[in-house]
Amino acid sequence: MFKFRKKSHQEVLDNIPNHIGIIMDGNGRWAKKRLQPRVMGHKAGMDALQKVTIEASQLGVKVLTVYAFSTENWSRPQDEVKFIMNLPVEFFNKYVPELDKNNVRILTIGDNSRLPKETLDALEKAVEQTKHNSGLILNFALNYGGRAEIVSAVQAIAKEVEIGRLRPEAIDEDLIAKHLMTDKLPYLYRDPDLIIRTSGELRLSNFLPWQSAYSEFYFTDVFWPDFDQQGLHQAISDYNKRHRRFGGV
């Protein structure tokens, strides 16, 4: 069992999840509470992500998948969408050197076709710069929708059947998983062990629906910009109290 002792105090965290997914929710409400524009909440959320990523890396987490922008988020006010689309540019310019120094590798899942060129260029540059790192994988779900991901996988499999490359009876869970965007992750860590959602909302919101079949869930009322290293520790501590049966007894 993996144990991590934080130097600053005597807390011991057992059984660190290999893959943690985070639905980073509450940026707008955080800003509203402070009488600030919603976009300031997104900016503060960016700083929170950096802190949590470094902490997760030091704890020994293998993959951190963060829900940065969903396919449904395009319906938000255009000024807000434009600001959010620029956040990856700002985040990577500001934080990639530190992430690289901490051996963090950056990947992404989602439909890149709708991303602005500046956003896509920054993302591709960060992926390229960190591709040789062997530590934590920071996996951005950007313009991602779980149902769309499954539909795309089914369509790809159907085409293989249509041209005679694949027999229908050969379709199984492993084959479907290989056609999902998370197939780029290490095989043992493709599915999240723990999914954290901030802000008090109690739903999955189309985030990794296939991959989360046996995930444990942790919900907190804390808005994402206020979620910090201690919040991550609390989530993992709660995770350690669970007994994962995977359908067994």
UniProtKB/Swiss-Prot annotation:
Name the needed cofactors.
Answer: Mg(2+)
Q: Which UniProt keywords apply?
A: Magnesium, Metal-binding, Transferase
Enzyme Commission number: 2.5.1.-
Return the InterPro entries for the record. UPP_synth-like, UPP_synth-like_CS, UPP_synth-like_sf
Gene Ontology MF, one? manganese ion binding
* Residue numbers annotated as active site: 25, 73 (proton acceptor)
From the Swiss-Prot or TrEMBL record, give the protein name. Isoprenyl transferase
Q: Which organism is it from?
A: Streptococcus thermophilus (strain ATCC BAA-250 / LMG 18311)
